[in-house]
UniProtKB/Swiss-Prot annotation:
One of its GO terms (molecular function) is RNA binding. It catalyses: [RNA] containing guanosine + H2O = an [RNA fragment]-3'-guanosine-3'-phosphate + a 5'-hydroxy-ribonucleotide-3'-[RNA fragment]. The modification Pyrrolidone carboxylic acid is found at Q1. Gene3D superfamilies: Microbial ribonucleases (3.10.450.30). Its EC number is 4.6.1.24. It comes from Gibberella baccata. The active site is at H40, E58 (proton acceptor), H91 (proton donor). This is Extracellular guanyl-specific ribonuclease Fl2. Keywords: Disulfide bond, Endonuclease, Hydrolase, Lyase, Nuclease, Pyrrolidone carboxylic acid. Disulfide bonds join C6-C102, C24-C83.
Amino acid sequence: QSATTCSSKPYSAQQVRAAANAACQYYQSNDTAGSTTYPHTYHNYEGFDFAVNGPYQEYPIRTSGVYSGGSPGADRVIINTQCQFAGAITHTGASGNQFVGCSNT
């Protein structure tokens, strides 16, 4: 995982990795963050050309710490069900409930 910028919000490679690792741990233990539904299936309706094959899971990424519940914000990391990092996406700048890619996605 590399650093990325979602809209104008930069994330370090470490922040991206932390979110992807949390998503993987929750997914593998069939658990979620707090009382939320994250991680959950990401259907890729937008048609992103990820470097790894799906199926995919989405999980919120934070600038401080790792998401553990509450408001997810606009930004997500995407992993596949083998816990391979696929990319980072954001609702910011997208219409409706869709996503656009962050830098490097």
